Amino acid sequence: MSDIASRVKAIIVDKLGVDENEVVNEASFTNDLGADSLDTVELIMEFEKEFDIQIPDDQAENIATVGQAVSYIEDAKK
């Protein structure tokens, strides 16, 4: 697991209070991890802060799973 992936996973565990074993790439924030719309906004904000990136709203709407978040952040950090 990359450093980015492990940091994303840690943020999700902290913010959503889920077991880290549930936080797999295919897991949907809302359907699998129980996040509501406010939770997803807070996750995006936390990703921006942690990785010092900006995620435009139109892009944030496309980040629905753990794997999508990791991929987006990895691309943004290149």
UniProtKB/Swiss-Prot annotation:
Residues 2-77 form the Carrier domain. InterPro entries: ACP, ACP-like_sf, PP-bd_ACP, Ppantetheine_attach_site. It is found in: Cytoplasm. Pathway: Lipid metabolism; fatty acid biosynthesis. The keyword Transport does not apply. GO terms for biological process: lipid A biosynthetic process. The keyword Phosphoprotein applies. One of its GO terms (cellular component) is cytosol. Keywords: Cytoplasm, Fatty acid biosynthesis, Fatty acid metabolism, Lipid biosynthesis, Lipid metabolism, Phosphopantetheine, Phosphoprotein. One of its GO terms (molecular function) is acyl carrier activity. The modification O-(pantetheine 4'-phosphoryl)serine is found at residue 37. Its main location: cytoplasm. PROSITE patterns: CARRIER (PS50075), PHOSPHOPANTETHEINE (PS00012). 4'-phosphopantetheine is transferred from CoA to a specific serine of apo-ACP by AcpS. This modification is essential for activity because fatty acids are bound in thioester linkage to the sulfhydryl of the prosthetic group. PANTHER family: ACYL CARRIER PROTEIN, CARRIER DOMAIN-CONTAINING PROTEIN. Belongs to the acyl carrier protein (ACP) family. HAMAP family: Acyl_carrier (MF_01217). This is Acyl carrier protein. The gene is acpP.
